[in-house]
């Protein structure tokens, strides 16, 4: 590579080189786009230049944990990440390597440390409901955040770190926690244009988080515009999970 000064990219998909060695090559040539394939869980696989990862179906892709998800840190171009519903996932350190991350579904996992999220300054949408995270201070600098779900974190008792997020549009806190009502009102005052929900209980995505109405004649729910966009961003309607067999380049 040193003999090719005009080199722009290198594709080493499925070449058998370890992640560590590939990362060393990428670090040695920061002006070259170095791409390879990583595997995580039991059946998830993506190239390191992907912008979307959908890995929230452990029954088919395998349950993610801190060990078999570590390779996600090499996917530095990710904008849309869904690793929800992974009960064994107790560490999300890999998101610290995703500076372009805009949407993150980290809900119904077992992690408690949100520190890695502080590096994701482009985050616009974050679901972290039903986790063990009670320290929200790493979120205080995420000024681009507009939609945040922290409902059903039963030991949560302090949302004051969110007061700085004055441009929030929706904040789901729910009622199944220890957050004082005074803090709820302070949050509403800090972000006057934000819809703050402190009533949902056993369904953290209830209220207007996903659906805004129900059409009795057509028997269909009317999607919230942001949820409709979310479904498009992740390919939920086509079940476009990051299984290796769904990757046309594999």
Question: Where in the sequence are the language-model features?
Answer:
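Concave beta-strand-loop units of leucine-rich repeat
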Residues: 1-23, 27-138, 144-185, 189-250
């Amino acid at each position: 590579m040193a003999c090719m000064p005009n080199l722009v990219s290198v594709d080493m998909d499925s070449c058998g080189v370890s992640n560590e060695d590939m990362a060393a090559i990428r670090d040695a040539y920061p002006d070259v786009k170095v791409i390879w394939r990583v595997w995580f869980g039991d059946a998830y696989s993506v190239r390191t230049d992907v912008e979307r990862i959908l890995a929230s179906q452990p029954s088919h892709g395998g349950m993610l944990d801190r060990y078999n998800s570590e390779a996600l840190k090499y996917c530095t171009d990710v904008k849309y990440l869904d690793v929800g519903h992974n009960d064994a996932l107790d560490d999300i350190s890999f998101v610290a390597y995703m500076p372009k991350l805009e949407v993150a579904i980290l809900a119904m996992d077992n992690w408690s440390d949100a520190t890695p999220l502080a590096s994701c300054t482009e985050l616009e949408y974050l679901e972290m409901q039903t986790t063990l995270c009670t320290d929200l201070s790493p979120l205080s600098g995420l000024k681009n955040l507009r939609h945040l779900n922290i409902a059903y974190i039963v030991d949560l008792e302090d949302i004051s770190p969110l007061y700085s997020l004055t441009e929030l549009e929706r904040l789901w806190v729910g009622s199944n926690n220890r957050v004082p009502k005074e803090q709820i009102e302070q949050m509403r005052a800090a972000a006057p244009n934000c819809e703050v929900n402190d009533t949902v209980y056993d369904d953290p995505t209830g209220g207007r988080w996903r659906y805004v109405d129900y059409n009795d004649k057509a028997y269909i729910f009317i999607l919230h515009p942001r949820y409709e966009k979310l479904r498009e961003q992740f390919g939920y309607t086509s079940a476009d999970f990051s299984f290796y067999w769904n990757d046309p380049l594999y």
